[in-house]
Amino acid sequence: MMGARWFRTVAMVLLVSLVHLTQAGAGSVTDDGRIRGRADAPITLIEYSDFTCGYCVKFFKETWPRLQAKYIDTGKVRFVYRDYPRADQGVGVEAAVAARCAGAQGRYWPMHDRLFSEGGRLDSGAFKGYAKVIGLDQTAFAKCFGERQYLESIFQDRQEANRWGFHGTPGFILIRTVGGPTEKEPAIAIPGAFPFEEFVEEIDRMLATAPRSQGAPTEPHGSTAVAQNSQFIIH
């Protein structure tokens, strides 16, 4: 077992406000399509990340494809991307805005994947080029990006990460999202781009005790289960 030297368990000790995630949220102001996987997957993996972060790129290129094939594409885990720009302005923020603006047109993931795979080409010219390649309405994208829409939501993601105890990127949260008293079960915080095998151990442990899915949730769409206005014990 990897033990506490690898991961930290986040125990919520005050009343937690839970907002449920469903794939119906794709394209909404809240999520803009930042969800991969089945809405009724028993486990959710949330990533807090920065498009300019070298370790985030490492995770995307080395670990993510294997996680996607083993868990997301098979319906065992749903994946949520959250923005964590490390600076208050600059390329990281602009890249997050570009991805959100693509999401407004239902093309969040194609933009996300290009931002992580294009070898550091992150500037306004590159963003416009990617927008054209993935088939966005150029005028709408330029307006959205020029007005820096979604800034408030982007920094809300960062605040959410801070409440989980993250102060760097990438950071991951594993939480049960189907069946059972999820608000009473500790989440698992993974503070860094750990190897694929470490994710596998924690995910498989949670899946071993996961209840059988009863179909997609019917609650209003929004963000995944997160702690709001609460406190944590970090072990």
Tell me the role of every PLM-derived stretch.
Residues 35-36, 122, 190:
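Short clusters of hydrophobic/aromatic residues that line enzyme substrate/ligand-binding pockets
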